[in-house]
Structures are given as C-alpha cells and as structure tokens.
C-alpha cells in the first residue's frame, strides 16, 4: 500500500512537471528573434540615466491639452521603459550586460529618489513602476537587489489599486508585479481577488468601461467639446493593464481567464475590438478619435478568447502602445 501511494505521488509530480513543460507561458517563456537588435539594446548600454531626488510633476492635462513633462518625469518614464527593454533582452538572450544595465538603472532610482511630492507624480509611480518591477522579475534570479526590493516597499504606498478606474487597473498591475518581484504570495493572492473585483465593478455586462468612454483630451476630463475623443484610448489603457496582470497571475498559479470575471473581460475585448474596427459604432464617435489602435494587448487576449473583430485587427497588424514589447514575442 505504501509503495502504491508513493507511486501515485510520483505520477502526480510527473504529470505536473510535464504540464508545465507543455505550457508555453507568454512572459516566462518569452521568445523573440533579434530582440536586442530591434530594441537597439547595445546603444542603450551606453546611455546615462539621471535619477532625481524628488518627483514633482505638474498635472498631465491642462484646459487646452497635454502638458509637456518636466525633466525628472521624462527621466523616470524613460528609465522605466529602458530597464524593461534591457531586462527582457537579458531574459531572451542571457547576455549579462543587459541584465546588469537593467539593475544599474533600477538601483540608481532606488538610491536617489526620496520624495513623491504631487498627485501627478503619484500617478506616474502607479503607471511606470510595473515596468520596473517586471524588469526586476526578469533578472532577479541572476542579479538580486535588496536595494531595489526596499524601493518597491517604499513606493507601494502609491499604488492606486483600490480605484475602479484606469488608475486602479494599473494599480493592480503595480501590485501584481510587486508581488512577483518580492515573492509576496499574500499580495499576489489578494491581487488575484482584486483583479476579479475590478472587472465586475469597472466593466458593465455589455463590456463597456463607463469611466473610460467619456474621456476628453483636456483637464475637463469627462466633458467639454472633445468629450469621448479619448474614450477608446482610455478603454485600451485600462484593458492593457488588466490583460498584463491577468497573464502574470496565470503564469504564477491563478488562472482567471475562464472565471466569471474572465468572461466579463472577454465581452469587453470583443466590444472594444468592434469599436476599433468600426469607430462609428463608438457612442462618442467624432473625427480624429485619439489612441484607437493602442491595442497591442490583443496579442495576449487572443490566446485566451475568441473575437472575430479582434482577429481581423490582429491580421491587419496596426497595433500600438506596446511598451511591454508584446509584438516582438515569437509565436
């Protein structure tokens, strides 16, 4: 009997190992052809990063449009995206130079940045720390950094995951990526629950994110003569974060794609795909809609859901807003 039980345990382990081997995870098993060349990583190795002691950004929008960001805000955003590219380059190529440069960037900000002094700067932490955290997740096994992990712990107070808006969607991604960077299983579990909660609260049964579709391109966020001109853009922006979060959760033990929340997400996927393919069906259609094709995240959703409209858009290939380099993933 004891031998039989041991045999069953052995078979279970074998099946689990084989299942993992057969599963091609989007990020964990990221494959790409010539990614270092396509992202000009060798040039990025020589670029100098200028971290700041404080972030003091003014509001992103004015009464007439988008404000030009200050030097420190530009540097923080550039650093986040560059560290991600370099870390992804390391993940794909195992070139240590890329991993070391990514860690150099992360540690520079961890050491220098001391204060976040405006609401807009808090927003920027919420929106860009996910790139930095994912960069660290890609390289931490080879290049662990207690300094950067302490930085994450300091910055987590600025997560906006409690909000049921695009800010909340990105806050959830901030939390998920923090959990992976810190090996914080409790935070990952809570984030999985919050992911589902956000979807049910932010996306209605028709797949519409009401807080997104009315967005204008001025500080009159949901009104004025351009009400809705960024409605599809902000829908895309929120769904991008929810999609990346969903994939990271999936790759780390929380398969929510087929859950009730996942099914609601699939409705939103098809809804926004229909709007993008036929913009005149968008409730706030107007000439010069902004950010309509910011839908590179469809590449991930297409692996889990079916949408004829999305399939057509993927076939056309006009996919933008690809800071996570999803288009470079080999099939």
Task: Please annotate each region the language model reported.
Residues 185-236, 240-241:
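Aromatic-anchored, glycine/proline-accented short structural segments
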